Regions:
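Secondary-structure transition/capping motifs at alpha-helix termini
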Residues: 265-271, 291-298, 332-336, 358-367
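Flexible loop/turn segments at secondary-structure boundaries
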Residues: 97, 171-172, 192-193, 217-218, ...
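Conserved short alpha-helical segments that host acidic/polar catalytic motifs at enzyme active sites
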Residues: 3-204, 210-273, 278, 367
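Conserved small/polar residues in nucleotide/adenosyl-binding loops
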Residues: 2-8, 399-405
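PRPP-dependent phosphoribosyltransferase catalytic core
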Residues: 160-161, 196-202, 357-401
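Extended, hydrophobic alpha-helical segments in both membrane/secreted and soluble proteins
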Residues: 275, 282-289, 297, 339-360
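A conserved beta-strand->alpha-helix junction
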Residues: 117-125, 297-309, 401
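Short, glycine/charge-rich flexible loops or terminal/linker lids adjacent to PRPP-binding catalytic cores
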Residues: 294-340, 378-390
């Protein structure tokens, strides 16, 4: 999230914190003031929330322009110095050919890259180096978009303005907010609405736009091409968010209604006592199913929200498995001897589904039925890191589930 106006530091602090559901590894803020120049702070947020790590930094930061981000991979923002000047870069997406692009730049002797503890190249730094190959930000961004295999949305902060670019296929959103004394941009619209802004523009696929304290100017027109990630509505997006004008919570509820309609039409409506949803994103799907089917909705398990994050966020598979099991606390009175249908938002690795079925039977459920709000994820996504497949992180197509009898 970025901002240009007189109270921007605190607004970016709170607005970036509203993106905490999108990442749990690194947070960063960069501001600029004529007196102090660029000021940057980056912290690990794996064991502490964004607000806790940055509240002292905010008191010290000064400037008339500021940008912040939360990342599940790279430390960001990255500072880049080139013929285009000194600027900060944030990015989101997956660069499949990062190593190849880095080698090409190094062979030209035109770049040094910041590496992460894993040894991988920081994607924001790579993008900044690609942009620096051209004589303007627009040409540089277009060049980077053409060279990158995968998905790249980015934000650049100079000492005068911010430039934002949505990926060519429009897989991820970038939204601009307006208030009487300034403008901002964000991934999530609700992040700035709580700060008094209202949405004034949503970037099209491939669009490049400059934002100043006086307004925004489209530097390069986008297209109506839409390949936005459906997982934003299914799972990843926050319930209050809207993408392409469609609210996440309403979509999930309607999806549950459609599942119930299909079951009723095909004679598959189960004889159960309750419909329940896997917290958090499975709950509205379950509410929609219950409303349409007439089966009562109940919460036989409660997510312990103070400490347990979403189960796909931890970096190791063993920790994901443990989180999936530990975060749900049973309400025995709503489980023992009951026939239950639970609704989950998706089946990616099968970990949570298996744990939930075992959890319900272990706590005395008589029958357990389940519905998934979207088809099983059969392959890892090469464009975004929502459901990527690695050697220890395999989609459900390769997983055999043994359920209790």
């Amino acid at each position: 999230l970025g901002d240009v106006y007189k109270r921007q530091i605190q607004d970016v602090f709170f607005g970036t914190d509203y993106h905490s559901h999108l990442g749990t590894r690194r947070g960063g803020m960069t501001s600029f003031s004529p007196e102090l120049g660029f000021q940057r702070n980056i912290h690990s947020i794996e064991n502490s929330p964004f607000r806790t790590k940055f509240e002292k930094d905010v008191d010290k930061m000064r400037g008339n322009i500021c940008i912040g981000c939360i990342s599940d991979t790279d430390p960001q923002p990255i500072m880049v110095r080139s013929k285009l000047g000194l600027y900060a870069v944030c990015s989101i997406g997956v660069i499949q050919n990062a190593a190849k692009l880095a080698d090409e730049l190094l062979e030209k002797g035109c770049a040094n890259f910041e590496t992460m503890s894993s040894g991988a190249i920081n994607s924001a730094g790579l993008i900044g180096a690609l942009i620096a190959q051209k004589d303007s930000f627009v040409d540089g961004i277009r060049y980077a978009q053409d060279k990158i295999e995968g998905t790249m949305s980015l934000a650049i902060m100079t000492d005068k303005s911010m430039i934002v670019a949505r990926d060519k296929d429009g897989r991820l959103p970038i939204i601009i907010g307006q208030r009487s004394d300034g403008y901002c941009f964000s991934f999530e619209s609700f992040a700035y609405q709580k700060l008094g802004y209202s949405t004034c523009h949503e970037l099209k696929a491939g669009e490049i736009t400059e934002i100043t304290k006086d307004g925004y100017n489209i530097l390069s027109e986008g297209t109506d091409k839409k390949k936005i990630c459906t997982f934003l509505w299914t799972y990843y997006g926050y319930p209050t968010a809207c993408y392409e004008g469609v609210n996440v919570e309403l979509m999930r509820t309607r999806n549950g209604e459609i599942m119930a309609e299909n079951d009723m039409k095909n004679g598959r409506l189960p004889d159960v006592d309750f419909v329940c949803g896997i917290p958090d994103s499975g709950v509205p799907h379950a509410i929609g199913y219950a409303n349409k089917s007439g089966i009562p909705f109940a919460r036989p398990f409660i997510k312990y929200t103070p400490t347990w994050p979403r189960s796909f966020m931890p970096t190791s598979q063993s920790m994901r498995n443990r989180v999936a099991k530990m975060k749900l606390i049973p309400v025995h009175e709503l489980i023992e001897g009951k026939k239950l249908l639970f609704v989950d938002d998706s089946i990616v690795r099968g970990t949570q589904m298996r744990e939930t079925v075992e959890f319900l039977y272990e706590n005395g459920a008589k029958e357990v039925h389940m519905r998934s709000a979207c088809p099983p994820i059969m392959y890892g996504c090469k464009y975004l890191n929502f459901s990527r497949s690695t050697s220890e992180l395999e989609p459900v197509s390769y997983t055999h589930l043994t359920l209790p009898t």
